[in-house]
Amino acid sequence: FSFELALRGANVLGIDISSNLIEIAKKRLPKNLKENAEFITSDMMQNHGSFDYIILMDSLIHYPEKDTVNILENLLKNTNEKILFTLVPSNFILTLKLMVGRLFPKSDRSPTLSPLNTKSFIEIYRDKFEREYNATVSSISKVSDFFYTSEFLELRK
């Protein structure tokens, strides 16, 4: 998304806690986009200024529900328009896959996921986001293939 947004004239700040991923992004950044895009190693919870849009692709999928809400609340304070984010929707098949994954030695496991019931998440926090931040939360789309499932949501001010 970063390159496409910069190509369309947006000023982009890409943040990741992985310095390796940031270095890859910097190397792949076309020279004509260097004025519009910057990539830094940091934590999304640090204050990096005010943004019109914040996009969190798979950034929240490792956090339990309470932490996810706290992160979104913190980011809403510095958001002018909306936050787009993905969550991993809980379902029987995913629960089964995660249980099977726990059978492997710890070093062979994938990162921890925190699936959430996204429909309940929206229903539970809709009033809170509207009341405290004048923001609406809704689902935009679902992405699913055999190994990857997520739901794309937005918090719009």
What are these regions (language model features)?
Residues 1-49, 70, 74, 84-157:
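Class I (Rossmann-like) S-adenosyl-L-methionine-dependent methyltransferase catalytic domain
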Residues 52, 81:
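Conserved acidic residues
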Residues 55:
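A conserved beta-strand element that flanks and buttresses the S-adenosyl-L-methionine
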Residues 58-59:
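Short catalytic micro-motifs in class I SAM-dependent methyltransferases
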Residues 64-65:
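Helix-capping/helix-break motifs at membrane-protein junctions
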Residues 76-78:
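Short, conserved loop/helix-junction motifs that constitute active-site signature segments
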